[in-house]
Amino acid sequence: MVDRWEKRGSEPLHDYGFLRLRKDRYRHPNLEGERDFLVIDALNWVNVVAVTPDQDIVLIRQFRYGVGDTRWEIPAGVIEPGEPAIDAAVRELREETGYAGDPPEPLCEVEPNPAIQSNLCTSYLIRNATLQHPTEWDENEVIEVVLKSQQEVRQMITSGEFSHALLQLPLLHFLTGIGPAASGGESAR
């Protein structure tokens, strides 16, 4: 059995606006002394698998600064403080693509990287998505909206063309029929 570490303190290091960096100090009952660990407090975010009445999936393609290149993605973004995740899903789909559809259904909720991050990522399925609004991109966004068949999306994931791991997960939940949206259940949290 793995014993729980005891938190001895926390020190804020820097606030970058969209994320904060802190140093937490822990002690383990089987180890001597205390250890410091860096933790990233990022805002929680949502992902949206939007499916049209023709069963196509709404994808976006945009430049990603971390890798210095464009990437295929699904609509996603941060949850604003005080905003319910389900409302953020509807907003992000509308802002990034102009699409709207049926009420969101939960697909999955995950911890992006619990080794160093404290946030959650919640994914929703929106069925019967159609183009209904003008896009409302953030100042640093330039987005291409593309409809792909479910088979094309499967091939993109298999080939590595769709490489964003946290965005693959909700797509795979949808494409394989696992998760609350497939069974009618609710999110784990």
Where are these regions (language model features)?
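Conserved Nudix-box catalytic region and its N-terminal flanking loop in Nudix hydrolases
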Residues: 2-4, 37-42, 47-91, 129, ...
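Short, well-ordered beta-strand micro-motif
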Residues: 23-25, 50, 125-127, 147-149, ...
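Acidic/glycine-rich phosphate/pyrophosphate-binding loops and surrounding catalytic core
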Residues: 100-113
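Beta-rich strand-turn-strand
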Residues: 82-87, 96-103
